[in-house]
């Protein structure tokens, strides 16, 4: 008999806690800051930076090929590797975004 009373008391406590939790005012979400960029803007900026890195690497390689003074082979190789790494990182981000989109689209409604 005491187990039944204990169970009922626990159920009443759980219900009261549930009611308290539901009665509490939910915090209002702050609106997005006016100056904060959106996700698409941030993504376009990242792609733009990768493009700039690729173009700078190509320009440096062309300058080295024509024998322009002040352009060292090590600088060309470093710029080339920076461009390669940034492009690979962008590709991985794209792959993860596509995978996330596919996962969301395959979720049952």
From Swiss-Prot:
It comes from the Bacteria. It is found in: Bacterial flagellum basal body. GO terms for molecular function: cytoskeletal motor activity; structural molecule activity. Keywords: Bacterial flagellum. GO terms for cellular component: bacterial-type flagellum basal body. InterPro entries: FliE. Its main location: other. GO terms for biological process: bacterial-type flagellum-dependent cell motility. Belongs to the FliE family. HAMAP family: FliE (MF_00724). PANTHER family: FLAGELLAR HOOK-BASAL BODY COMPLEX PROTEIN FLIE, PTHR34653. This is Flagellar hook-basal body complex protein FliE. The gene is fliE.
């Amino acid at each position: 008999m005491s187990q039944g009373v204990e169970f009922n008391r626990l159920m009443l406590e759980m219900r009261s806690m549930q009611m308290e939790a539901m009665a509490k005012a939910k915090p209002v979400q702050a609106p997005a800051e006016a100056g904060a960029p959106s996700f698409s803007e941030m993504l376009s900026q990242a792609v733009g930076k990768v493009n700039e890195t690729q173009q700078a690497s190509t320009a440096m390689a062309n300058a080295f090929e024509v024998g322009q003074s002040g352009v060292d082979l090590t600088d060309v190789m470093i710029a080339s590797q920076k461009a390669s790494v940034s492009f690979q990182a962008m590709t991985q981000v794209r792959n993860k975004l596509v995978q996330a989109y596919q996962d969301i689209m395959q979720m049952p409604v």
